[in-house]
Swiss-Prot record:
Catalysed transformations (reactions): 3-amino-2-oxopropyl phosphate + 1-deoxy-D-xylulose 5-phosphate = pyridoxine 5'-phosphate + phosphate + 2 H2O + H(+)
Principal EC category: transferase
Keyword Transferase: yes
Protein name stated in the entry: Pyridoxine 5'-phosphate synthase
UniProt site positions, description: Transition state stabilizer: E162
Keyword Lyase: no
Amino acid sequence: MTTQLSVNVNKIAVLRNSRGGTDPDVLQAARTCIAAGAHGITVHPRPDQRHIRAGDVLALSALTREHAVEFNIEGNPFAPPRAGYPGLLELCRATRPEQITLVPDGDGQLTSDHGFDFAQDTTQLAELIAAFKAVGSRVSLFVDAGNPDIAGAAALGADRVELYTGPYAHAHASGQTDTALALFADAGRRASAAGLGINAGHDLSQANLGDFLAAVPGVLEVSIGHALIGEALYQGLEATVRAYVDILRGSQVGA
């Protein structure tokens, strides 16, 4: 089985919002990604609406259903609703995405940079996971590879974990990947042993994705946005998505 590519289109919305109006068009970008072979689309609507907004979520939900690809909504389940942001659970109830990825990021964070601490978040998180699964969606939890209790995600009711790959990307850029890859491979094995599916994301790129998949068995999905959109500035969006799909086809799950 080939690892699936879900393209995160947040950065398209960042560029649109920086000027106002509707250009570049998030929906058109998503269509291009799907036509080029992306298996899904990811968004991370934040309460401050810095990029993806509630209206985008609704429109992208319809688009992904039309094209029979998966829709993955990321977000902080603890963030309360506010003006323009109905809350993650309400957005998911309105769209029923194939996957909901829960991420413990605060309002002031530039980007997601750590996973859940199951020692602190358990009771409320278990209740929230049950509520999200009642929507009919698969639930994935954002976790650090070094988390000693990755299996705890299964006990809380999650279906998958998404390994936060930022530390691996930094290690790869510095030419020191062995220790990082060993850590992620171990995390993958522990997740699989607990019956959890494995996703991965954050700072994955054409330069480092192949090495990661070769070392970490069983990755079902990668969510890639920042690097992909940056590369697309030089290579074109369609060509960039096709390049990622080619990398994934060369790295079979479980190989």
